Amino acid sequence: MRFNTRFIAGCLLVACAGWPLSGCGLSALSDDPDTLYASALRASLDQEHTESARAAFHYMKSTNPDNVRYDRAEKLLAQNVEALGLDYAASLFYLDIAESRRDVRLVGDAVGALERLLRRDGYDQMTLRDGFLARAEITGLAPNERAFVAYHQGLDSLRNNLMDWATERFSQIPKTSPYRHRAEYALIIHSLATYELDEVLERLEVLSQAEDLPDDLSNEIHRTLGRIGFEQKRFDDALREYELIRHTATDDPSLLLEMAWSNYYLGNYQRALGLLVALDAPAYSGLIAPERYLLEALSLEQLCQFEPARIAATRLRARHGHALDDLHAKTPLRESSAIRAAARHRESGRAPADFRRHMRHEAAKFAEIREQFGPQLAQHLDQIYAHGLQEAERREDAQLFGQMREVSEELLTAEEGVRLVLHELAVSVLRGRERDQADPLYRNIEVPVGGDSVFYKFDGEFWTDEVDNLIVPLEDRCVE
């Protein structure tokens, strides 16, 4: 369900005859529309944002949407609440201007503002992207805004498997637009469903060499190349791609986990263990990946470090014991706070969770400055944020259940893996420390006496610029 922008207009048109516009600490506003509009414009130029927003809102209340300056006043209102950090309210005002098309001269400005807001975290994805941009029929936009709309409409068509529509929308994006490369990447990723990996690789390699690639898109391209290399068991190639982006994707702990798996399959057990230790950094505490404990145990097992491997395997229960207990007790998923907390950190569930967190943060920010808006605008913003918070909670609950099911399945699978590893460890102890010939060749890492690299002993303190360089130089106790 998307936010109905008629709700905004309806609130704005509520009769307000006789409302006092002055209050404690607030300047009185004129009842003359021309004076109100001039006051809003002057205050905006002087960066008096609450005063400008008050005057613009009162002007809108004193007239109707057919007024020639109604949308200009709403634009002033949107710009000033945005300047105050109230992005959600601003997005709805911009959306009303773009969607209603009362003043076609302002539609492009409103769409450009929506583009700016969509670059930020925690925006209302369902209302702005999936509701308006995906289906809007807007003409007369400048090339940049036209490319922005075409890109999002093409993405929506791809999500609905409407390939012809997606191709047609993407073809409208000029070659010089930054959205052109994003559209090409989206088409390539969609073609992965055909499993024609060689063709996909070739197209990705070409795209990765394009000029002026945004950093986030470049990271995604190399990440995808790395994942394809991993699936094709080209682990050296996968690591090469991951190494290209690890210093520009420091906020993505799942990248370290993928690097750890690649190192494990190459026999780089010390390096794999170092990357897994890095995942214990407080900055990465939100990562929910039960498999990491299995990988740690498997890496230690390959070094015939049987007791550390056993301890590593049991860390799964130490970290997710409450969630596992709920699963074994057959607690309904919606009633498990442990599984709910884990699901909120899932990448696919991050958008609704971010929207909810952002709404709470922004509502708190509004509450701090509420009295500066005067009673009428404050009441209107109260309604907007009350509705937005309710909708954010509803959306997260709706999507979170699917994430909770995925987390539950991963936890149970990892728990079964732990049982198998513990069994293998028991067998290995009886068998001795002879290395299985089927295992990859162990690559020992030794600290050199000289050289260009400097090695430091890890003291338990994590530093962002060093966290992905950790190595665990455990002794290989296996016998060849």
Task: Walk through the language-model features, giving the residues of each.
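Residue at a conserved register position within TPR or TPR-like alpha-solenoid repeats
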Residues: 43-44, 81, 118, 157, ...
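"A position-specific structural signal for the A-helix of alpha-solenoid helical repeats
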Residues: 38-39, 76, 112-113, 145-152, ...
